[in-house]
Amino acid sequence: QSSISSTYDTTGGFKYDADTKTLTLRNCTIDTYTKASSEQLSGIFKYYNVFLDSRNVGTLNIVLEGRNYIGDSSSLKYMPAASDVNTPRYLGIWGNTVRFSGSGSLTVEAQTFPIQSGGIETSGSVDLTLRSYMNGTVTRSMAVGAGTSVTAETKGNNLDFYALNVKNNLTVNGTLNATTKGCVYQNDYPVALLVGGTLRVVGGQVTATSDGRNGNDGCQGYGIKANALEIGGGGSVRAYSNGYSTKTSQYDGKEAIYVSSNLTVDLGGYLYAKTQNPILSNENENGALKVNGRWDLSGTNGDTAYTKAVITKPVNGSIYENVILGTTVS
């Protein structure tokens, strides 16, 4: 049942229309898998156990009715790189573009990559939960539609795992929550929400939390790391970097929000970034929010535009409270 290549009957709570490439799930559980080549380099693990492999159908439409489940909760465990290369990792949905619609919910639980795809789109009133122990969902592009909800969660703290990795652009009109407990001291990761292009929040809500306090000692992670961030149409973004370092008594240098190019906040947009670290001997060096490019806040306050990197202290955001109208950074 894990390879979409034929028409199924409805005995398992699902049906497939090959003409429209539409898979309908109705109170369905898919917990069987097929073994597939991992397509990794030589010397790295060779196989995935894939619960739903749709790579051969192009764009797959998944209609959700009722409560649905794909995966196996017992696969939520760590597997080190030194493991036998012939031991498969568990992967949830592997496909090209996957479009979710309908009024139901879907929980995907897999050891790594709840979804690995060329694109993810949600519409209707669907509710997705994408849970892994190791690296989370990875896709080239993603659109979270109005009225829909997506939760991406990575539970492992062994390495610098991300919860959601969007290689290009991510647009959020609905609700998106991303949380990672990944933990590596003074590394470029972990990141709860990693966006290689533009994170665009228009009327939607994004909350991202990197919770290194639940990991190994000395961990701080990015809540959001994006090339560009745009907030408008009443959209809101909240990001948290929760970490500590009792070994070094130093802040680990990861902001709640890091934007490598430009930040734009239009009228009605809301931005909140906070680090939570009980031991901060170097708090002036790093902060809750960092932008390497240009601040464009003309829609919020016409007098405000920054053309160089700006860093806040982790706790004291007073430098911004009188500058960015309707925006709190603390």
Predicted feature locations:
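A composition-driven surface/loop motif
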Residues: 1-330
